[in-house]
Amino acid sequence: MSTAKLDDSTQRPLYGERIIKESKIICFENPNKKRIYEISIDLPEFTCKCPFSGYPDFAKLNIIYQPNLRVYELKSLKLYINNFRDIKISHEEVVNRIMDDLLSAGSPHWIHLNASFNPRGNVSMQLDIFSGQKKN
């Protein structure tokens, strides 16, 4: 192993880590408020840590929603989701926290959040949360 002294730039948080840590869900104006339509977003690389073992948990998140006045901006959503990768949190708590933040940021007519956690120890878990009234 090298004993070379690290320069200051390698000891500070990297710019990507800073951006992820400071991220919030951003929305923009719905371009067609008069039309009812659904948006589906897949986030296949979600990670957080088990609060009991510290082992990583992996999941695929799927968000389906009918926007009201605002639409979720995808890059900010990706960065927000990446912020959970080092947080020790249960499946139930993290999915409810994400739903709360989605509702707070976008106030959709209707939203469904599905989290499909990869098997660990021969057990997989799927969580579904709904909010609002779906319009036809």
Swiss-Prot record:
* Pathway assignment: tRNA modification; tRNA-queuosine biosynthesis
The record's active-site residues are 50 (thioimide intermediate), 57 (proton donor)
Enzyme's top EC category = oxidoreductase
What the entry lists under SUPFAM superfamilies is as follows: Tetrahydrobiopterin biosynthesis enzymes-like (SSF55620)
Entry EC no(s): 1.7.1.13
Q: Is this entry keyworded Cytoplasm?
A: yes
Any single GO molecular-function term of the entry would be: preQ1 synthase activity
Gene Ontology BP, a term:
tRNA modification
Keyword field: Cytoplasm, NADP, Oxidoreductase, Queuosine biosynthesis
| Name this polypeptide is given | NADPH-dependent 7-cyano-7-deazaguanine reductase
